[in-house]
Design a protein with these regions (language model features):
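Extended amphipathic alpha-helical interaction segments
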Residues: 92-134, 141-144, 176-184
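Post-signal-peptide N-terminal segment of Sec-exported extracytoplasmic proteins
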Residues: 38-73
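C-terminal amphipathic alpha-helix
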Residues: 147-189
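Short, charged early-sequence alpha-helical segments and their helix-coil boundaries
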Residues: 72-94, 149-159, 163
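C-terminal motif of bacterial Sec signal peptides marking the signal peptidase cleavage site
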Residues: 16-19
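Bacterial signal peptide processing site
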Residues: 21-23
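Sec-dependent N-terminal signal peptides
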Residues: 4-13
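Membrane-interface starts of transmembrane alpha-helices
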Residues: 47, 51-59, 91, 125-133, ...
Length: 189
């Protein structure tokens, strides 16, 4: 009798654990819906310069982070301000990637753009580009109190663009023995 009762209890616990874990996991269809929604962020700074495979990895990281915090899909879907929540996860994931590897700055300031702007010479090899991005990331880390503050400055502050350009020019000068000329225009009312 005890064996039957013990077997029944163990079976009930095991089945409830399996039942709960299935209920808490998102389906492939639900994950795919969120991946499609993340496509709307493709033109956002940093994401627009990712290769397709890099973007798929990035969106997978965002989906995973959301799924961990909202294990029940319906809870996530019914969130008021769900779009804002997704945007917070997108920005947080970008910041995490920048913290993890400063070379990821190449996605915000791609090499062809820096050549076009006259910051870097054309034809740099991968090693020289990496040295530039490492120098630039060190200057950014010294100047901004956090990666989030840096990202906010890049996205929304036009005054920071000049500061960032100056940092880029300083790194280019340090690495390639270029002279720097900084023109500053002061407008007096």
């Amino acid at each position: 009798m005890r064996k039957i009762l013990l077997f029944t209890i163990v079976t009930a616990v095991a089945l409830s654990a399996v039942g709960c874990s299935r209920e808490r996991r998102w389906s492939d269809r639900e994950r795919e819906e969120l991946h499609r929604e993340l496509r709307a962020y493709r033109d956002m700074i940093y994401l627009e310069n990712l290769a397709e495979a890099e973007f798929n990895t990035f969106s997978g990281d965002v989906v995973e982070a959301i799924e961990i915090d909202y294990p029940v899909y319906t809870t996530f879907i019914e969130l008021p301000g769900r779009g804002d929540t997704v945007e917070v996860y997108v920005v947080s994931t970008i910041v995490e990637e920048l913290n993890a590897n400063p070379h990821n700055m190449r996605n915000i300031f791609p090499y062809p753009y820096l050549v076009e702007e006259g910051v870097l010479p054309a034809g740099l090899n991968h090693q020289a580009q990496r040295a530039f991005y490492d120098c630039f990331s060190k200057k950014v880390k010294k100047y901004y109190p956090s990666t989030q503050a840096f990202f906010n400055a890049v996205v929304g502050d036009s005054n920071s663009q000049q500061t960032l350009t100056n940092m880029q020019m300083q790194c280019a000068a340090d690495l390639f023995d270029w002279g720097i000329e900084i023109d500053e225009t002061v407008v007096v009312d």
